[in-house]
Amino acid sequence: MNLIKMSDIDLSGKRVLIREDLNVPIKDGMITSDQRLQAALPTIKSALDNGAAVIVLSHLGRPEEGKYEKKFSLEPVADYLRKNLEYPVRFVKDYLSGVDVKPGELVVCENVRFNPGEKANDEALAKKLANLCDVFVMDAFGTAHRAQASTYGVAQYAPVAVAGPLLIRELEALNQVLKAPKKPIVAIVGGAKVSSKLSLLKQLVGMVDVLIPGGGIANTFLKAQGFEIGISLYEPDLLDEARHILILAKEKGCQIPLPTDVVVGKTFSETCPAFNKSLSNVAEDDMILDIGPETIRDYVDLIHEANTIIWNGPVGVFEFPQFAYGTRAIAIAIAESDAFSIAGGGDTLAAVDLYDLNQQISYISTGGGAFLECLEGKTLPAVAILQERAKHVKTN
């Protein structure tokens, strides 16, 4: 990878602006999952250990741009970092006109999405952010697919722009899957909609040996094959696309196994009774909410044969315990496998957290959209600008 790394630069005494992805779930002012914070801490600590004056940027949630909303404030994140770092930590709301920060000190800036022009990559905003630093470090893989002021624009105008350790780790893990994967490769792609993962599914059939669809995606494939799926979630306008993917998979030698039995309910609720049914017995008023025990066994066997595993999305409504058996079994099978495994996407990470399997997956990606776009073979804008800056440095 043609990138300058943070570790290549002498940070001592320099103002170092780090873009992290600290977009964590917060309920009643409390952080409910610190996974992204734990992933970012080593980068921040390394910069501080090396004598830098550190400023951290991040977004949180989806506020109306340019408008302050307390529930989207990064103040709880600053409190968390204060408790988890042995360095002074300050939280600053107004930072665009400059930040007073000393070596060995961390300043956490308020949500970048409170700034008008962030999403549109406004040039004036990007230049103000760039003026805060001597070195810009892009470490937020989760937002690397967005060309925004705090991810792309600032990297254009900062005196030096480099890749952070977390970003490098993410790209290296994905390269292991994309460039030289050990076969057979099994991909599990779950979630509600085929439409949101259409490009990914088409890309994967030409790359993997087995593609296991789950959730609403599997329902669309089942309906496309003429199976009764009752009132289950599916996308009627994508049935032809699903058929095309099945034909494409056959041409490419990619197996797409579909459920032979399912777990159904009559309503989408936590208290809804669950019933195992063979696919041929699904009724008109049934809702498919998980895979059945026979399908679980088949999928687990396929996972155990893999040397590389890609996991994005649950195979059932795992938030409801009676419909969680499929996702749990898949997660445990991946964790128990000796294969190189990479997992990404919000729901996937929630499942990994729920079943306490963080240490047993080879690599857990902090990215959702960025993870998918990498798997689709797309170039991430925030990585592209770092590569461009690296080229420029090397020719001077």
From Swiss-Prot:
One of its GO terms (biological process) is gluconeogenesis. Keywords: ATP-binding, Cytoplasm, Glycolysis, Kinase, Nucleotide-binding, Transferase. PANTHER family: PHOSPHOGLYCERATE KINASE, PHOSPHOGLYCERATE KINASE 1, CHLOROPLASTIC-RELATED. Its EC number is 2.7.2.3. Pfam families: PGK. GO terms for cellular component: cytosol. It catalyses: (2R)-3-phosphoglycerate + ATP = (2R)-3-phospho-glyceroyl phosphate + ADP. Belongs to the phosphoglycerate kinase family. Its main location: cytoplasm. It is found in: Cytoplasm. ATP binds at K197, E319, G345, G346, D347, T348. GO terms for molecular function: ADP binding; ATP binding; phosphoglycerate kinase activity. It comes from Legionella pneumophila (strain Paris). Pathway: Carbohydrate degradation; glycolysis; pyruvate from D-glyceraldehyde 3-phosphate: step 2/5. This is Phosphoglycerate kinase. Substrate binds at D21, L22, N23, R36, H59, L60, G61, R62, R113, R146. Monomer.
